[in-house]
Amino acid sequence: MIEKSQACHDSLLDSVGQTPMVQLHQLFPKHEVFAKLEYMNPGGSMKDRPAKYIIEHGIKHGLITENTHLIESTSGNLGIALAMIAKIKGLKLTCVVDPKISPTNLKIIKSYGANVEMVEEPDAHGGYLMTRIAKVQELLATIDDAYWINQYANELNWQSHYHGAGTEIVETIKQPIDYFVAPVSTTGSIMGMSRKIKEVHPNAQIVAVDAKGSVIFGDKPINRELPGIGASRVPEILNRSEINQVIHVDDYQSALGCRKLIDYEGIFAGGSTGSIIAAIEQLITSIEEGATIVTILPDRGDRYLDLVYSDTWLEKMKSRQGVKSE
């Protein structure tokens, strides 16, 4: 038998977590901004954490067996994470998606062998979330031994981030954390990580980054193009009282944020990361220099080549926001 070093894992799933952190010196020279590179998880996003945590919890407690058919509504990243883990564990999976899913994400999910159900009709808020949920309910009623991941209401979602990235952040950052800035959709990541951070840094301010047109914090619903941030419903796992500030960012600002990050730091990240960069740029205009800001970069940029990294898409979003060309 070959003796393995500590760096050699038994399974790809063992490489989920322990993502690196980097300081964004060039982009934010007057503040200490630390970014956790969640896109370096094996499935390419922070969604590997809840996918692994929820499935392994279900298996441990007998809720998921070899005959179980996993069902989930997803804009892409959780679908990829679930598809990866389902393939490794030999489970069946159906992902309910909508037309806003990036073409790359859709191809990856299908490459893992997952079933895909595409909804076409938007819901009353102009998004597709409620339509996707209705399709999930239909599948649950017709598929034997179906198990709904239900990321918007599943307490295991935020717990995965509490025990995962949240714990890793407080173990890495030894100085007081002034601000924790995170994007919201299911709100699992901001709820879980902030709860762990507040245990160690009780004075940390929790800043949620939401999409303009998302209804999570009561904004008026409008059409949104960028997947993976915002929602057309309020997640059950959200506790608004734990959020100190909300910054809304539009699709155009998010795309500019992505491009600034790659220009200044060489980091090629996804659309919600651009939202974070734009939000931090707003935040630092109202705080003292030298603040310690911690954030997360949720997913990889190569999944958004047809969106935030497309000049055609950028011009479309620019026109929609009424930004005048120079």
Curated annotation (Swiss-Prot):
<dbReference type="InterPro" id="IPR001926">
    <property type="entry name" value="TrpB-like_PALP"/>
</dbReference>
<dbReference type="Pfam" id="PF00291">
    <property type="entry name" value="PALP"/>
</dbReference>
<dbReference type="InterPro" id="IPR050214">
    <property type="entry name" value="Cys_Synth/Cystath_Beta-Synth"/>
</dbReference>
<dbReference type="InterPro" id="IPR023927">
    <property type="entry name" value="SbnA"/>
</dbReference>
<feature type="binding site">
    <location>
        <begin position="185"/>
        <end position="189"/>
    </location>
    <ligand>
        <name>pyridoxal 5'-phosphate</name>
    </ligand>
</feature>
<feature type="binding site">
    <location>
        <position position="77"/>
    </location>
    <ligand>
        <name>pyridoxal 5'-phosphate</name>
    </ligand>
</feature>
<comment type="similarity">
    <text>Belongs to the cysteine synthase/cystathionine beta-synthase family. SbnA subfamily.</text>
</comment>
<dbReference type="GO" id="GO:0006535">
    <property type="term" value="P:cysteine biosynthetic process from serine"/>
</dbReference>
<feature type="binding site">
    <location>
        <position position="272"/>
    </location>
    <ligand>
        <name>pyridoxal 5'-phosphate</name>
    </ligand>
</feature>
<dbReference type="InterPro" id="IPR036052">
    <property type="entry name" value="TrpB-like_PALP_sf"/>
</dbReference>
<comment type="pathway">
    <text>Siderophore biosynthesis.</text>
</comment>
<comment type="function">
    <text>Catalyzes the synthesis of N-((2S)-2-amino-2-carboxyethyl)-L-glutamate (ACEGA) from O-phospho-L-serine and L-glutamate.</text>
</comment>
<keyword id="KW-0663">Pyridoxal phosphate</keyword>
<keyword id="KW-0808">Transferase</keyword>
<comment type="subunit">
    <text>Homodimer.</text>
</comment>
<protein>
    <recommendedName>
        <fullName>N-(2-amino-2-carboxyethyl)-L-glutamate synthase</fullName>
        <ecNumber>2.5.1.140</ecNumber>
    </recommendedName>
</protein>
<dbReference type="GO" id="GO:0016765">
    <property type="term" value="F:transferase activity, transferring alkyl or aryl (other than methyl) groups"/>
</dbReference>
<dbReference type="InterPro" id="IPR001216">
    <property type="entry name" value="P-phosphate_BS"/>
</dbReference>
<feature type="modified residue" description="N6-(pyridoxal phosphate)lysine">
    <location>
        <position position="47"/>
    </location>
</feature>
